[in-house]
A protein has these predicted regions:
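Conserved, carboxylate-rich catalytic/transport cores that coordinate ions
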Residues: 2-11, 18-34, 182, 292, ...
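Long, charged N-terminal accessory/stalk domains
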Residues: 1-395, 399, 410, 423, ...
Length: 871
């Protein structure tokens, strides 16, 4: 199996980076995105690491940029995105960036502070202007003799007349419009009705300088008598957050004051406009480089985070890092390190040393925009073990095909294909838009999955001969009614047609059935009353056939895993019993289906036995049923043999494998005791004689040295020793039988594990086969929904014969199209998608796919900037 069908071969490597070149080397590795750094300081607190101060400085710069970005969005200024990917700035450039951001932040804060103060002053002057205008109207109204009676109660002991209102005190102010009713009630109750309130709404909304919101306010003036009422009124105004302003008592003073306020408002408006223009210029200039600044800062922050994962030499001149990387990309990584060293100006080259380890490497499957969606489907179930067979390449075909078996409709498939083609053709433009809609992004990410699902749905729709619940008669039906009227046939007549609501064609009559339809199902079945009987039988058998083939393919893939990981025990006591067990029972059932289809024709079909009864009798060893005739000679002997073979496979998987594992453990234990008794000088000779290779021999021959406080091996080179051979890395205990010598062996645990696996597989073969019947059930449901929608909606418009039928048909077609998309494409499509997902995760992948690995997460600027990784 090539690299396409397995994860990439990985290696653990050690990087020796000079302190002055480490920053640039990590920067180049981030641009490459092919190494995953390991944390060599797991016990060191995050705040006690070497580059924590640099990380904090980057976070502070990021905070300032977010503040500027917030101001840009508040001003509705678009951010320029040229798609440029700037290089990472050097560490010495951080000071310049900090100074730039500090200056920009302070300038914006100063502008905002001044602007807020100016707006607050402008608001106060505007409110005072409205007060002066409205109070003059109030006083003019108070001069009206008709209103004197209303205020007479406030002037106890007065003589009345024109000068009476001037004896009253008053306050004027502005309050939010929604608080007026409560404010008025409070004044009435607290002052016991001894105040006189006049109010008027300000027509234009006023801008709140603190929030920038538009607020509706009202002007009020309160007349009262006495200092006690005055204090009460002011406290109430203060409680309701009303703004009080001084208002002259004489009309002349009010007029002069209004003129002065208008003049100040004009001057203030001019200053506000200039301030806003300056603010816009600053923000527009910042918006042009905002994205570039963000990229630079976040790249720097990511680099320093990564450097904190490294170990530092005691001389402070070298950084040591450990990384997982694909073997196929080692040359690219070496080249990136060389570029980083040259950029930094260092004369000492960076060193990449491949290490030998027993740790399980991460799983890395290379994908492109086409295969990434299918790989995500597999990874959602579980990340594959290292170098395990990857189901994604097979899923590219099997997933949309099984979906189409359930969804099969030519018309719906065309609609789905067109929608996916739109996303594929315009993918560059849609990617550039960077939509925040999660639902759209999810659909867009699976555009190639949807495209294949649509194409396969067209194919299965052709096989089913189903287009919006109607059949297409492209080649002419293979059935004919005319021979039934002949004397050699059923001797039908027109009276026969009139006297029978339902008549059945006899394919045994010559000329009635002229052979199968060239492509798909004969369209005559679309008008037959026994359509469901025929289609249900066909689709049910087809589901079982496809399911058994799919599962057998999954079991067959496990063979390649056992061969690759060199586990002959799993082949002879795992794969072979599993494939034989399934083939003996369900593979035989598939052969019976094809045999019955080919062995019985129109003349003998009435004598065809039931496969279901045959299969049940086969498992129960019941061959005395006279109602169910045998299919072929010697059927009893063959079926008994197959059942016995299947039953023999169960103890082979359950008991034999467990005993062999125990025997292997005892043999290893015997060898280890023999090693302890054998003198050290004869150990290697005895190992050579027994053919057992010591994994530690190479290590004992290799010396070690101290390199900056870190113990580093100085063993042979890659060519001499083949360091990090993929076979050594790929060793993992898939079935619990490949344990190292140090691992304890518990016979009870192994027996229980093997019993669970055997029972799960045997019962799973039965339940999984039945589970594939969902292909038939979903296909039937989709076809029936499509037919109901056509009959209940579209048929009404097409059957109209009136002059308004065209307009009615237009409305009905719109409803039909909406329901088709909403119910059949989206809801039914999602249902079929989920069922296909289950068939792959449970019925297919559990035959060979462990899915207990961990994903390769490389240090990549692209992933960090797209938000796929935490910074």
């Amino acid at each position: 199996m090539g690299e396409l069908f397995r994860s990439e071969e990985m290696t653990l490597a050690q990087l020796f980076l000079q302190s002055e070149a480490a920053y640039c080397c990590v920067s180049e590795l981030g641009e490459l995105g092919m190494v995953q750094f390991r944390d060599l300081n797991p016990d060191v607190n995050v705040f006690q690491r070497k580059f924590v101060n640099e990380v904090r400085r980057c976070e502070e710069m990021d905070r300032k940029l977010r503040f500027v970005e917030k101001e840009i969005k508040k001003a509705n200024i678009p951010t320029v995105d040229t798609g440029e990917n700037p290089e990472v700035p050097f560490p010495r450039d951080m000071i310049d960036l900090e100074a730039t951001f500090e200056k920009l932040e302070n300038e914006l804060k100063e502008i905002n502070t001044n602007q807020e103060a100016l707006k607050k002053n402008f608001l106060e002057l505007t409110e005072l202007k409205h007060i002066l205008r409205r109070t003059q109207q109030f006083f003019d109204e108070m001069e009206d003799p008709n209103l004197l009676e209303e205020s007479s109660a406030l002037m106890e002991g007065s003589e009345g007349g024109r000068g009476a209102p001037l004896r009253l005190g008053f306050v004027a102010g502005v309050i939010s419009r929604e608080r007026i009713p409560t404010f008025e009630r409070m004044l009435w109750r607290v002052c016991r009705g001894n105040v006189f309130l006049r109010k008027a709404e300000i027509e234009d909304p006023l801008e709140d300088p603190a929030t920038g919101d538009q607020v509706h306010k009202s002007v009020f003036i309160i007349f009262f008598q006495g200092d006690q009422l005055k204090n009460r009124v002011k406290k109430i105004c203060e409680g309701f957050r009303a703004s009080l302003y001084p208002c002259p008592e004489t009309p002349q003073e009010r007029k002069e004051m209004l003129a002065g306020v208008n003049s100040r408002i004009d001057d203030l408006q001019m200053v506000l406009n200039q301030t806003e223009d300056h603010r816009q210029r600053v923000l527009q200039a910042a918006s042009k480089t905002m994205r570039v600044w963000f990229i630079k800062v976040r790249k720097m922050k990511a680099i320093y985070h990564t450097l904190n994962l490294c170990n530092i030499d005691v001389t402070q001149k070298c950084l040591i890092a450990e990384v997982w990387c694909p073997v196929s990309d080692l040359d690219s990584i070496q080249f990136a390190l060389r570029r980083g060293t040259e950029r930094s100006g260092s004369t000492v080259p960076s060193i990449l040393n491949r290490m030998q380890t027993k740790q399980t490497p991460p799983t890395f499957n290379k994908t492109n925009k086409f295969t990434s969606g299918f790989q995500n489907i597999v990874d959602a179930y579980g990340i594959g073990n290292y170098r395990e067979i990857n189901p994604a390449p097979y899923t590219i075909i099997t997933f949309p095909f099984l979906f189409a078996v359930m969804f099969g409709d030519m018309g719906h498939g065309v609609l789905m294909t067109c929608a996916a083609l739109y996303l594929v053709i315009r993918e560059s433009r849609l990617l550039a838009q960077k939509s925040d809609n999660e639902m759209f992004n999810m659909v867009f990410a699976g555009r190639y999955i949807i495209l294949l699902m649509g194409i396969f749905s067209i194919y299965t729709g052709i096989i089913y001969n189903d287009c919006f619940s109607k059949s297409l008669n492209m080649f002419g039906s293979g059935w004919s009614v005319r021979p039934m009227f002949s004397p050699k046939g059923a001797n039908w007549s027109f009276e026969t047609l009139d006297g029978n609501a339902v008549l059945q064609l006899d394919p045994a009559v010559p000329g009635v059935f002229n052979g199968p339809y060239p492509l798909g199902i004969d369209p005559i079945w679309n008008v037959a009353t026994n359509k469901l009987t025929f289609l249900n039988s066909f689709k049910m058998k087809m589901s079982v056939v496809l399911g058994v083939i799919h599962m057998l393919f999954g079991v067959s893939l496990s063979l390649f895993n056992h061969l690759y990981f060199k586990k002959p025990l799993n082949i002879f006591l795992g794969f072979i019993p599993e494939i034989v067990f399934m083939s003996s029972l369900f593979g035989y059932l598939v052969l019976l289906v094809f045999y019955k289809w080919t062995a019985y024709d129109a003349f003998t079909s009435k004598d065809a036995p039931s496969l279901l009864i045959h299969f049940i009798n086969m498992c129960l060893f019941n061959y005395n049923d006279p109602t169910n005739k045998p299919l072929y000679r010697g059927q009893m002997g063959i079926q008994v043999l197959l059942v016995l073979i299947a039953l023999a496979c169960v103890p082979c998987m359950l008991i034999v494998k467990t005993m062999v594992l125990r025997r292997q453990h005892l043999w290893k234990k015997h060898l280890s005791q023999k090693r302890e008794e054998t003198p050290a000088e004869n150990l290697e000779q005895s190992l050579e004689q027994t053919g057992v290779s010591s994994s530690c021999t190479g290590l004992t021959q290799q010396g070690t040295q101290k390199f900056g406080g870190v113990r580093v091996g100085n063993g042979p080179t890659e060519d001499e020793a083949g360091i990090m051979d993929h076979d050594q890395l790929s060793q993992h205990s898939e079935e619990g039988d490949e344990h190292s010598e140090e691992e304890p062996f518990d016979f009870g645990d192994v027996a229980v594990h093997q019993a669970i696996h055997t029972i799960e597989y045997c019962l799973g073969c039965i339940s999984n086969t039945a589970s594939y019947l969902r292909l038939w059930a979903l296909s039937l449901a989709h076809a029936q929904l499509s037919e109901v929608l056509w009959t209940m909606v579209m048929h009404l418009g097409l059957s109209s014969r009136s002059w308004g039928g065209f307009f009615g048909l237009s409305i009905i077609f719109a409803a039909f199209a909406t329901l088709t998309v909403a119910i059949l494409l989206i809801m039914e499509g999602l249902s079929a998608f989920l069922h296909a997902l289950r068939l792959h995760w449970v019925e297919f992948q559990n035959k060979f796919y462990t899915g207990q690995g961990f994903k390769f997460v490389p240090f990549s600027f692209e992933s960090i900037l797209e938000g796929r990784l935490d910074e």
